Structure formats: structure tokens, C-alpha cells
Amino acid sequence: MNVNGRVFDQAHAVVSVFDHGFLYGEGVYETLRTFNGQPFLFDRHMQRLRNSSRMLMLDVPLSDADLLRRCRQTMDAAGLGHGPADEAYIRILLTRGVGELSYDPGACPTPSVVVIVKAQVDPSVDAYERGVTLALVDVVRNHPGSVNPLIKSNNLLNNALAMQQAARRGAYEGVMRNFRGEIAECTTSNLFVVKDGVALTPPLESGLLPGITRAFLFEVGAEAGIPVREAVLRDNDLLKADEAFITSTTRGVVPATKVDDQAIGSGVPGPVTRALGAAYNQKAQELTRETEKRKA
């Protein structure tokens, strides 16, 4: 763990109870993982971190290079991220910092920066081979006029409530709709459906976090010759899809083969899902090996 530049073990890493990230959820974060010991798509994650912080009028006190150094320092201390045998999960948290009990941003003179590193744990083989179950939950995704979903905020109550409902129904992920009833995203991932060989995902206008893996899959699909497009989706588009899958940084492409009690398509991971998943994994390996060579 790294708290404001100092490395601690988990038992001794602390932040103040007066940190506004703790008091008010006032902060942003990014989650990354390594492939071949390299933080994957680091630059894109940092761009999103800065976009999120800008919307909160929160300064990022470090350069991307400094943040990368802190990640590597923390990975080294944890004995992780040296190669394929010990890949790392990385979370970077930026908060308003320590201040008085006040919503006034001026109450916090210095932002807090925390880096958490632990071993990367991939989903089970069964999740990739048989697929996971989704649940259409009643919790509505944040309205952009309140807490904009474009902000990857430390305040995750909206997602947590949706995940609680999904978990009670035995689902792996909850599918959230926006205030218009359109599908937005899942609780911790972006959603794609496949129809007639085309992978479709809701546009940002449907009120979702711009996932790094989601965006990268457009590039992966183009290289693999698989159409990947944005489209407004509703419940029936998911229920009547040929295939479906979810994407996230730590999981890549995970097939979804069931919604509540209904099978999606044939009820097994489909060819488009498998092809995109394989192409994504191959591209991740290629890019991180190139980074490793340049570093050497």
C-alpha cells in the first residue's frame, strides 16, 4: 500500500478520518491490472483519472510518470508485477484530502493519493467457459444531472445498491438502466450484446462510465474483422440477443449466458464473444511485451 508516497503493509496503511474521500466520497479512482508485469493501458487510465478529477475540480498533484513510479514502487514492495506468474491488481485513489467538516473544497489544502496493490485474481475458468448470469435490477443509474456517470467516483453507492440486489438474486452482475429505461451498464462492467454477428454496446449518452476495455474493444474488433458498434439498448435487446458479454479492466471479456432465469441465445458463450475475448487477450499480451522490451 502507498499512502501519499510512503509504502506500508496492509495492517499499517491508514488515512485520516477527516479525509473528504472518507467523509463524503469526494474523490476519484482508477483500477488497473498488469500483463507481463506491465500496467496495461496505463496512459488511457491516467487520462480518464484526470478527466474525472477535472469534473470534480480536483487537482492531480502528480505527473503520470510520478504515478507510474508509485505504482511500481508499491508493486515491488508487494513482490508483485514481475511477470506472468505474479500479475498485479492496482487501484489508484485520489481524494480531496484532509480538512474540516465542510463541503467547501477550500477546506482541504492538499489532495491525498493512495495506491493499493494486490495479486490479480482472474475470474474462474468456469466463468469464461460457461458464462455468467446477469440480473436486470431496479436501481436506476445516476442521472447525469446529479452525479455524472462519466466520473469514476469514489462514491459508489449507486453501484453498491444495484450489486446488492443482483447478489440477492444469485447473479454475477446487475444490469442498470438509465432514467429513460435504456440499458446503461452493469454494476462493475460494461455490457455488450451480439446480434447477427455485430457486437453492440450502449453509447455514452445512455449514462455510463466510459470503460477503458469497452473502448479498446472497438480497436480489437476492427483488427479482428468483427463489427463493434454503439446502439441504444433496451431490455428486449438483451433478452433476445444471440450472445452477450461484459468487459472490465480486471476481467477482460466475460461471456454472459443468462439473464435472471432466461438463457441468452443458445445459453453458452457464442463465437463472437469467444473471438473478441481471444483477440483482446492476444492484443494485451502483444502490447505489454512491447512495453517490456522498450523498458529493457
Features from the language model and the residues they span:
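Secondary-structure junction motif
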Residues: 213-214
